[in-house]
A protein has these predicted regions:
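Proline-centered loop/turn at the N-terminus of a beta-strand
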Residues: 164, 211, 243-245, 271-273, ...
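Conserved core of the PLP fold type I
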Residues: 107-242, 254-266
Length: 419
């Protein structure tokens, strides 16, 4: 047997015997050449063959990693954020190709399981623990993105007499459209950079009309703010007291380097519905989301889901499961943290030059300013065509996105305020 074949056989045996785990990094080319007393070219030939067999995958300037082991049961490992490349497309493509090997019987044929692929549910359950979301597998449902989950929730009834949905103002624009286009009765509660008025929240809950309170507690878009722990605790307490379900949309959780606690963590009475989206972290075409439901809502949710589709794309579900379990998702998330932190520092540096005396929050790729009513005149709105404006009852807001001309836009904004 030739030397490169010996290397291949040893690594395959290691995978069979679980000595090499999913996501584990192999020894370097240099280390293997010394171990097997051969040239680096010989080792490289072995690596290329293993890569062709979809047993390993390469990370630029890092090395080779095990794509999948035999029992599919191992957990994600800690990896250096510098290992990951610019975008997850290539790694996800590898997982997509691997998901098609030897699984035709249940991926290409009919697989009726509305709650989602069992492997992905297991992967998501483990992943959510990183966000302090502790849920059981039988509470999880895989959906075709968070938008489908929100649509289904708006169709559901909870308790007799409760017909309205409470949303924050401002909030996720697609949620507003979803409610309005269906003619669903709703109320709003003002939110600014400091949070919401808890007394007003209790007053609205007391009406007995609210079935769901839709909120983005962490890295709110467009405000960029996060509820403090006291506010989160109070919201959960009020939801229990007035029998209201909370829809917690945590779609930017992967960008929260502070790892703040979600409402779901504080909930001990099954009042919080937790929604996790993978689109912001990976790419828009991946329309897969996950929702953790209180037991009393799960059956109703699945019945409504069955009216929309038979099941969420099984091949993409399997690919995402592989992507999570072999460590690729963890590396991509860490890489995004690195990019986000670099953006945050650049925005912060620009802001510190002007010593602004107005409230603001830095969020994912933007900064949002809270301004007194009336400052956002038509002239400034024309000046910043690519910025986002929104008006509240007590304040106006301007969101400037981080682009190449961010410093120039910020300078124009400061000059406008000083006129």
């Amino acid at each position: 047997m030739k030397k490169y074949q010996v290397i291949i056989q040893d690594i395959l045996t290691g995978i069979e015997e679980h000595r090499f785990k999913r996501g584990e990094k192999l020894p370097s080319i240099r280390q293997l050449s010394e171990q097997y007393h051969c040239s680096k070219d010989t080792v490289q030939k072995a690596m290329l063959e293993l890569k062709y067999q979809n047993k390993i995958y390469a990370v630029e300037k890092s090395g080779y990693y095990i794509l999948e082991d035999r029992d599919f049961q191992d957990h994600t490992v800690e990896l250096n954020p510098a290992d990951f490349q610019e975008l997850p497309y290539e790694d996800f493509r590898i997982c997509l190709n691997e998901s098609l090997i030897g699984r035709e019987n249940y991926l290409f044929n009919y697989y009726h399981q509305q709650e989602g692929l069992a492997e992905l549910i297991s992967s998501v359950q483990s992943l959510l623990m990183d966000y302090h979301v502790y849920t059981k597998k039988d509470q999880l449902v895989i959906t075709a993105g968070s938008q489908q989950a929100l649509y289904i929730l708006t169709q559901m009834e909870t308790l007799a007499g409760k017909t309205e949905i409470l949303i924050e103002n401002p909030t996720y624009s697609r949620m507003i459209e979803l409610i309005r286009h269906q003619g669903i009765p709703y109320q709003t509660i003002e939110r600014d950079l400091d949070g919401i008025d808890l007394e007003e929240l209790e007053s609205i809950f007391q009406t007995g009309k609210i079935k769901f309170f839709y909120t983005i507690p962490r890295l709110h878009n467009p405000l960029g703010s996060t509820y403090d722990i006291a506010t989160k605790t109070a919201i959960v307490k009020l939801a229990k007291q007035y029998d209201v379900y909370i829809i917690e949309d945590d779609y930017l959780a992967d960008f929260d380097s502070s790892h703040s606690l979600p409402l779901h963590y504080l909930d001990t009475d099954n009042r919080v519905i937790y929604i996790k989206s993978f689109t912001p972290t990976l790419f828009p075409a991946l329309r897969i989301g996950a929702i953790s439901l209180p037991n009393q809502l799960r059956d109703s949710f699945i019945k409504h889901k069955s009216l929309i589709d038979y099941d969420t794309n099984l091949i993409m579900q399997k690919a995402l499961s592989l992507y999570i379990d072999n460590g690729m998702f963890a590396r991509n998330t860490q890489h995004l943290h690195h990019i986000y932190h670099a953006q945050w520092n650049k925005i912060k540096d620009c802001l510190e030059k002007y010593a602004l005396n107005i409230p603001y929050r830095i969020s994912k790729g933007s900064v949002t300013f809270q301004l007194s009513k009336g400052i956002l005149s038509p002239s400034i709105q024309h000046m910043f065509e690519k910025c986002y404006y929104f008006s509240g009852q007590k304040a106006d807001f301007l969101q400037i996105f981080f682009e190449q001309d961010f410093a120039d836009k910020l300078g124009q904004f400061v000059r406008y305020l000083n006129v």
